[in-house]
Regions:
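Extended, highly charged
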Residues: 1-541
């Protein structure tokens, strides 16, 4: 694994992305309420490849009523692509999983400092009534459907009143007034750690302190969406991701600590008695979340750097920045669980399907060829049960199938699955993250074994050496740019004989007549056309 060199705050990360040509700066006036997110969304709806996506820095942000903001807005700066995400950890893309596994095993405790850049400017009291949240360039994520501007790239910090352990989660927060937010923390099984804290404060008949961080070191922000175990301090895991302690500072008006190098921190108290209607809002499951009663947060302070950058993420329909944030970390953590917690042999890769299905619903588990069937089924069951919200459909494939290619998955199911014996359903799983309209709270799991269970003839494409030569020839001829799609060459799958290799080699040398002489000598009568040669000649021998 490469040595970690994670940026210490969001602006250092932005500078590094800029140096690598991964930032598009937009100086034209952009309306945060109608234009900003739709423009960034085209990166995901416009057919761009991962490596073509960029972070967008909007430096001339205006509002629907003519407001002008002196704070730039960064969208796509966390995870428009895996490359941008990896830059936030200071490692190559291939090391993302290793960094996460190491951080979970070797967390680094934060250090408390007396003051930090996040408190260079402090707004409290009447200042909040006059401007407060309205002074921030908070975009509307889904214009035409969202009920308000929403904070999306959040770290909502809360603390367990019993043991004092903090939790950081990424939860949406709607602007309600200059000094009030509507906060949604998932109450479902495997939902928000902050919600569990809220339940405890409710029993104590106390308001819940909350600090919402908007922009800080990417490694810290990455912990928010990852659904770490309850009572795991995300700040320590973030230190593991950075390879150094996170500098923290005490909040001004609530008893919480936040990253000292944050861009903006919104402090407040969440009501545990009365809930307020919140939504609609375009959610990461790909549908609009309708109006629900959710938490109401009274803002007690807004602290920030003198020149902060406001951070927002593209969520809603996948692929999105939100799904990349989860995918690049979920997949290695699932693989680590299957291999080293459950001890499953033969598992080589876990891929969570991203387009439209939002990662959580469909999981592909890849196995080495020849893995015992018992291990294949243990692996699928393990993937389906690690998180309550993940694994409605789990499909196992062999290692010649690209699990990122849905067409290859269908091909594997069509030719390698017997739906009498290779399919299993399990009832009573949580419906998880999704639209509520017409859905039951419970649903089932479907598992399909689409691995190679016996030998098969080779894949009917030219052998690799000929396809490689043809690829070079294609480029020499200056034909339209091509991107190889797996499978792009033929390969053996166990059902092949040496004499057929000899025939094929003779054919490409132009010696096909010799093969014809061979087969002429092997003619046979009293047979039906399409009778396999092997069976007849084996009996003859």
């Amino acid at each position: 694994m490469s040595k970690q060199n994670a940026p210490s705050d969001l602006q250092e990360h932005l500078a590094r992305l800029t140096e690598r040509g991964l930032v598009t700066v937009i100086g034209k006036p952009i309306n945060k309420d109608t234009e900003l997110h739709p423009l960034a969304r085209w990166q995901f709806q416009g057919g761009l490849r991962d490596e073509e996506r960029r972070a967008f820095l909007f430096t001339n942000v205006v509002g629907a009523k003519g407001e002008k903001y002196d704070i730039p807005v960064l969208v796509g700066g966390l995870a428009a692509s895996p490359e941008i995400y990896a830059a936030g950890l200071g490692v190559p893309v291939g090391d993302i999983g290793k960094v996460w596994v190491k951080a979970m095993a070797e967390p680094v405790q934060p250090v408390l400092v007396n003051d930090g850049p996040c408190q260079q400017i402090v707004e409290t009291g009447d200042d909040l009534k006059r401007s407060g949240l309205a002074s921030l360039p908070v975009p509307i994520s889904t214009p035409g459907f969202d009920s308000a501007p929403y904070l999306t790239a959040t770290l909502c910090v809360t603390k367990d009143p019993d043991n004092g352990i903090q939790n950081m989660g990424t939860y949406r927060a709607a602007l309600k007034a200059n000094d009030r937010l509507g906060v949604r923390m998932a109450s479902r099984l495997s939902g928000a750690g902050g919600y569990l804290h809220w339940q405890k404060y409710k029993k104590l008949k106390r308001e819940m302190p909350c600090a919402i961080v908007v922009g800080c070191a990417p490694a810290v922000l990455f912990t928010g969406p990852q659904k770490l175990a309850i009572d795991v301090d995300e700040m320590a895991v973030a230190g593991g991701l950075m390879g150094a302690p996170v500098r923290t500072v005490r909040c001004k008006t609530v008893d919480l600590v936040v990253p000292a190098d944050s861009e903006i921190v919104i402090e407040g108290l969440i009501d545990t008695d009365l809930l307020e209607p919140e939504g609609p809002f375009g959610e990461s499951h790909g549908h609009v979340a309708l109006e629900d009663f959710n938490m109401s947060m009274r803002v007690t302070a807004i602290t920030r750097k003198r020149k902060p950058v406001f951070l927002s993420i593209v969520s809603q329909v996948t692929p999105s920045e939100s799904s990349v944030l989860k995918k690049v970390a979920y997949e290695p953590m699932f693989l680590e669980h299957l291999r080293h917690v459950l001890g499953i042999r033969g598992v080589t890769r876990v891929v969570m399907h991203e387009p439209l299905t939002n990662l959580r619903k469909v999981i592909f588990v890849q196995f080495a060829r020849g893995t015992p069937r018992t291990e294949v089924w243990r692996g699928m069951q393990g993937a389906a049960s690690l998180q309550a919200q993940c694994g409605k459909l789990v499909i196992a494939v062999s290692d010649d199938i690209d699990p990122e290619n849905a067409n290859a998955i269908f091909w594997s199911m069509a030719y390698r699955s017997d739906f009498n014996t290779d399919v299993l359903t399990m009832p009573y799983r949580s419906a998880g993250h999704g639209p509520k309209s017409g859905r039951a709270a419970e649903e089932g799991t479907l598992m399909i074994d689409a691995t190679l269970k016996s030998v098969m003839p080779p894949l009917a494409l030219p052998a690799e050496e000929y396809m490689r030569r043809a690829h070079d020839l294609w480029q020499e001829l200056d034909l339209p740019r091509i991107t190889p799609q797996s499978p792009w060459h033929g390969y053996e799958l166990g059902d092949w004989a040496p004499e057929w290799t000899a025939f094929a080699q003779a054919a490409v040398r132009g010696d096909w007549r010799a093969s014809g002489e061979n087969t002429f000598a092997r003619r046979h009568g009293n047979l039906k056309p399409e009778t396999p040669v092997r069976g007849v000649e084996k009996k003859k021998d």
